[in-house]
Amino acid sequence: MSNWSINDARTGYNVNYWSQGLYGISDEGEATVSPDPTRPECSIGLNELAKDMVKSGVNLPVLVRFPQILHHRVNSLCQAFNQAIQKYQYQADYLLVYPIKVNQQQTVVEEILASQVEKEVPQLGLEAGSKPELMAVLAMAQKASSVIICNGYKDIEYIRLALIGEKLGHKVYIVLEKLSELKTVLEESKKLGVTPRLGLRVRLAFQGKGKWQASGGEKSKFGLSASQVLTVIESLKSEEMLDSLQLLHFHLGSQIANIRDIRQGVSEAGRFYCELQKLGANVKCFDVGGGLAVDYDGTRSQSSSSMNYGLTEYANNIVSVLTDICNEYEQPMPRIISESGCYLTAHHAVLITDVIGTEAYKPEDIQPPAEDAPQLLHNMWHSWNEISGRADQRALIEIYHDCQSDLTEVHSLFALGQLSLTDRAWAEQVNLRVCHELQGVMSSKYRFHRPIIDELTEKLADKFFVNFSLFQSLPDAWGIDQVFPIMPLSGLDKAPERRAVMLDITCDSDGTIDQYVDGQGIETTLPVPAWSAESPYLIGFFLVGAYQEILGDMHNLFGDTNSAVIRLDDDGRTNIESVLAGDTVADVLRYVNLDAVSFMRTYEELVNKHIQEDERANILEELQLGLKGYTYLEDFS
């Protein structure tokens, strides 16, 4: 493609849309990051960054974090709500609460909190959904607003720890998820001499659409029904503690793609709020929960990997709907809280790793079948020879279908012992040749060709074997078909010569990425420069900062990857601030209660028994290094 330009690459990978200006492709065809969006001219080439890290001893794969992106996301979200509050003359403020379940890494939480250091009035709190998370936020929330929201199921210990948080100077909202929690909170608060701050999670009738819609609606796992809400009100009145009810919470589900769903949910919850006020409650906070989506594919659509709205529109809709309802009921306007973890963290992290090998189809010379060969083979040979002579575009479809049908029958006859292995191999090669040549003559300008072109593209795509575990680093791609943008880190200034699928190094056929972002939406293959064994070929997996680390598992005992924190200094220079080593083999063995020390003793016994004396020291050293080594492949970095 002689007229290829760098803008074609930017369009082909849709990077201008899913990246929101944080990632890009340089004029030299290198993938870049702009860690500090206030200085877009200070971009970092990811390919060179990865090579520098490898030279310094950091093996691939490596998860690269850009903390300045976290700061930018916090400030952007707060600014959007602050502007909406001013625009609609809303009579209360906004608080952003980070649910640490999205990414509990210390570096991430501390950087999110650090974004508020220079704020005169911090607009950031933390959310916990379990006892371990609560213990973490009790030690960190004072670095921002000291607001803590406690969600999830709660036992006595959880509730007491939350109440102790009040004694430590925090503002801890205990959100009632079940009716039975109220009694425990009231009893333990009296024992500790603490006035609790209570919240109610209401179960809305409306249910947002998407993969996580089950977390909202009448059948959701959490929340109180309308009648249960009234029971709580009566119980608090009887205890003369109605003033303790200070927060209303609801959750439509994560990754809400349609802004109309958000408007409708806020509208229903807003009426809950006003009705509670009419009953004498003094609710001060309106917590819209999560739902703010991330546009993973950059299509700005209602797909489950996208969103049909922007940040300003999101804030404006919530503020305007709540303003109108409060004015209608003549009730005071509550502080607005949102729990937007994915929006804050997804963009800040990139997984960088290397392609360790490929498998690609290359046309081979094929001899015609022998005269006495089975008729099926002659049919396939005839189909191949028919391609070049067919001017009728619809006839090409017939050739394709005939050849696929014949190949299926070949496989059946081979399984019955009626065809030889040589016959089968010949038929498979002819079929690939037919597919290859049809791919060259079919055209997407014919609508009836398009489905077959898609099939051929997928069938003939190269296989890229990539040094990572899908289950450890991109578990959502496997578990829920989540789409993540993927790009080669260099060579993008030239037209892509191949299309490929990415396969990980686990011994599992599910370790394959099935969906790829491109300029047309979601495809089953990715356009890529040709691979060469002569030089490193690096791939970036983008927007992996939300949930992926904590959800990742150790399939085949591939452990945590190396990680690094990268920051731009005041002069625009790139600083590798810290590197956290990934799991060693000994680490992952210990996680599954296998003892590397006892293994080493066993190795020594076996070496002494089976290895000649002059080799023993070297063999033992290799075994020891194996236990200390990285769980991923190291020879290719």
UniProtKB/Swiss-Prot annotation:
Q: Which residues are recorded as modified (N6-(pyridoxal phosphate)lysine)?
A: 101
> What is the recorded function of this protein according to its Swiss-Prot or TrEMBL entry?
Catalyzes the biosynthesis of agmatine from arginine.
* EC number of this enzyme: 4.1.1.19
According to the UniProt record, what class of enzyme is this? lyase
Q: Which keywords does this chain's UniProt record carry?
A: Decarboxylase, Lyase, Magnesium, Metal-binding, Polyamine biosynthesis, Pyridoxal phosphate, Spermidine biosynthesis
**Classification via Pfam families:** Arg_decarb_HB, Arg_decarbox_C, Orn_Arg_deC_N
Q: Which residues of the sequence carry a binding annotation for substrate?
A: 286-296
Q: Does the keyword S-adenosyl-L-methionine apply?
A: no
Family named by the database record: Belongs to the Orn/Lys/Arg decarboxylase class-II family. SpeA subfamily.
Q: What InterPro entries does this protein's entry cite?
A: Ala_racemase/Decarboxylase_C, Arg_decarb_HB, Arg_decarbox_C, Arg_decrbxlase, De-COase2_N, Orn/DAP/Arg_de-COase, PLP-binding_barrel
Gene3D superfamilies cross-referenced by the UniProt entry: 1.10.287.3440, 1.20.58.930, Alanine racemase, Lyase, Ornithine Decarboxylase, Chain A, domain 1
Which cofactors are reported in the record for this sequence? Mg(2+); pyridoxal 5'-phosphate
The name this protein carries in UniProt is: Biosynthetic arginine decarboxylase
What's the source species' lineage? Bacteria, Pseudomonadati, Pseudomonadota, Gammaproteobacteria, Alteromonadales
* Species this protein is from: Shewanella woodyi (strain ATCC 51908 / MS32)
Mention one GO biological process in which this protein takes part, according to its record: spermidine biosynthetic process
Q: Which reaction does it catalyse?
A: L-arginine + H(+) = agmatine + CO2
GO terms for MF: arginine decarboxylase activity; metal ion binding
Please state the pathway this protein functions in, per its UniProt record.
Answer: Amine and polyamine biosynthesis; agmatine biosynthesis; agmatine from L-arginine: step 1/1
NCBIfam families reported for this sequence: PRK05354.1, speA
